[in-house]
């Protein structure tokens, strides 16, 4: 199945580079729709992740390292790879520990006593722009770019991706 090989699949951009086909890469960039011009992301990352114990004693769950990088860095990379550069992160527990470049932040000071819904409201309130598509994700769920590509293909006003094996 795809899951067993997806980490070994090279993006088309890399194939163009390896083949020295810069004209094809330029054509792809010129003619494919520019998702970043009409999309933004909101990442809900306010929780501590207390179930992780000492691992999150001095850092939020979203800053726990996976393969040498914080969870949040992997998520931001997936958005960037899909052309989504406008990213807003809702912080809560130890907000100063979440400080990645080129993203904006909203803080949920009541994160410990509220749910993700208030974090969503905080994020939406700090970056309101109804003219852009909005992708919302959790700060502790890593996903691949193809998930965003699949969402972008839908004509529906509202779509949710669910991991049926979780």
Regions of interest found by a model, annotated:
Residues 54:
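Canonical Radical SAM [4Fe-4S] cluster-binding loop centered on the CxxxCxxC motif
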Residues 24-25, 95-96, 144-146:
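Short, well-ordered alpha-helical microsegments
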Residues 139-141:
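The conserved acidic donor/metal-binding loop of glycosyltransferases
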Residues 20:
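Short, conserved phosphate/pyrophosphate- and ester-handling motifs at nucleotide-, phospho-/glycolipid
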Residues 57-61:
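Short alpha-helical oligomerization interface
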Residues 2-16, 27-43, 51, 65, ...:
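Conserved N-terminal catalytic core of the sugar/cofactor nucleotidyltransferase
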Residues 146-166:
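Conserved donor-nucleotide/metal-binding helix-loop-beta segment in metal-dependent transferases, i.e.
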Residues 48:
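Conserved SAM/SAH-binding loop
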């Amino acid at each position: 199945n795809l899951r067993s090989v997806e980490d070994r699949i090279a993006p088309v951009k890399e194939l163009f580079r390896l083949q020295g086909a810069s004209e094809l890469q330029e054509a792809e960039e010129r003619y494919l729709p520019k998702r970043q011009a009409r999309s933004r992301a909101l990442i809900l990352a306010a929780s501590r992740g207390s179930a992780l114990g000492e691992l999150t004693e001095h850092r939020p769950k979203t800053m726990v390292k996976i393969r040498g990088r914080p969870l949040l860095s992997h998520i931001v990379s997936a958005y960037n790879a899909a052309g989504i550069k406008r990213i807003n992160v809702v912080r809560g527990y130890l907000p100063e520990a979440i400080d990645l470049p080129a993203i904006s932040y909203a803080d949920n000071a009541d994160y410990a006593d509220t749910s993700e819904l208030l974090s969503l409201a905080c994020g939406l309130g700090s970056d309101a722009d109804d003219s852009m598509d909005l992708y919302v994700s959790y700060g502790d769920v890593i996903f691949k770019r193809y998930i965003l590509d699949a969402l972008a293909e839908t004509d529906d006003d509202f779509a949710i991706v669910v991991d049926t094996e979780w």
